């Protein structure tokens, strides 16, 4: 049976049971469990430093009222980061290449930030739909444009994460396939292609980390507008 390049993005199944939930739970096994020791080991210390760094970066734009979101945003950042990095391992499934999953993360959190603004400061939240100093004839058009841009925010969040990871995985598979195909006939070109593959893999490691950070950072900026 001929396999398609997009088969790697299909959700794996065992006896008809989707295994995507298992892949979502696996990153939690990599996190060190807390203990009662006075001195933590190197892994726990590194994890604590990383979480503090993420929390500081995400909470800096927010006021004190937004600090209650620190736990969920930091947890989401760690979750996406681990899933993206684990998806770069050979023969693994990356759940964040599924638009349905990314939308399931983006839409509820975006809606929560929007409802927070409408509850706490409705006039300011609705005021974002009409920029200050807008000429009167342009008011209806600008309200429609701003409303549309507001409603497509969760779609943009989900599509951005899906597209970046999907494109990277496809490039890696295409170049690795070309490397194996050229090895028997043109070994020199195959070595050069393997070098490109190594550089692309390093780039994808950076993309996996950056996209997880951008996803959560944009959510924190949406929250900043509504608190």
Curated annotation (Swiss-Prot):
It catalyses: H(+)(in) = H(+)(out). One of its GO terms (molecular function) is proton-transporting ATP synthase activity, rotational mechanism. It is a multi-pass membrane protein. InterPro entries: ATP_synth_F0_asu (IPR000568), ATP_synth_F0_asu_AS (IPR023011), ATP_synth_F0_asu_bact/mt (IPR045083), F0_ATP_A_sf (IPR035908). GO terms for biological process: proton motive force-driven ATP synthesis; proton transmembrane transport. Belongs to the ATPase A chain family. Component of the ATP synthase complex composed at least of ATP5F1A/subunit alpha, ATP5F1B/subunit beta, ATP5MC1/subunit c (homooctomer), MT-ATP6/subunit a, MT-ATP8/subunit 8, ATP5ME/subunit e, ATP5MF/subunit f, ATP5MG/subunit g, ATP5MK/subunit k, ATP5MJ/subunit j, ATP5F1C/subunit gamma, ATP5F1D/subunit delta, ATP5F1E/subunit epsilon, ATP5PF/subunit F6, ATP5PB/subunit b, ATP5PD/subunit d, ATP5PO/subunit OSCP. This is ATP synthase F(0) complex subunit a. It comes from Struthio camelus (Common ostrich). The lineage of its organism: Eukaryota, Metazoa, Chordata, Craniata, Vertebrata. The gene is MT-ATP6.
């Amino acid at each position: 049976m001929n396999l398609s390049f997009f088969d790697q993005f299909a959700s794996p199944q065992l006896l008809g049971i989707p295994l995507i939930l298992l892949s979502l739970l696996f990153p939690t096994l990599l996190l060190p469990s807390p203990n009662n020791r006075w001195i933590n080991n190197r892994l726990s210390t590194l994890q604590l430093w990383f979480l503090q760094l993420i929390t500081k970066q995400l909470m800096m734009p927010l006021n004190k009222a937004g600090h209650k979101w620190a736990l969920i945003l930091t947890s989401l950042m760690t979750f996406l980061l681990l899933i993206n990095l684990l998806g770069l391992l050979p023969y693994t499934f990356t759940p964040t290449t599924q638009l349905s999953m990314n939308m399931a993360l983006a839409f509820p959190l975006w809606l929560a930030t929007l409802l927070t603004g409408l509850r706490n400061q409705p006039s300011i939240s609705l005021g974002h739909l009409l920029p200050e100093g807008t000429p009167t004839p342009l008011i209806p058009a600008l309200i429609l444009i701003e409303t549309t841009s507001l409603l497509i925010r969760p779609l943009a969040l989900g599509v951005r994460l899906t597209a970046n990871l999907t494109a990277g995985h496809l490039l890696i598979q295409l170049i690795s396939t070309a490397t194996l195909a050229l090895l028997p006939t043109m070994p020199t070109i195959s070595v050069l292609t393997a070098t490109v593959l190594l550089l692309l893999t390093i780039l994808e490691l950076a993309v996996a980390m950056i996209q997880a950070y951008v996803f959560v950072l944009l959510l924190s900026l949406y929250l900043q507008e509504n608190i």
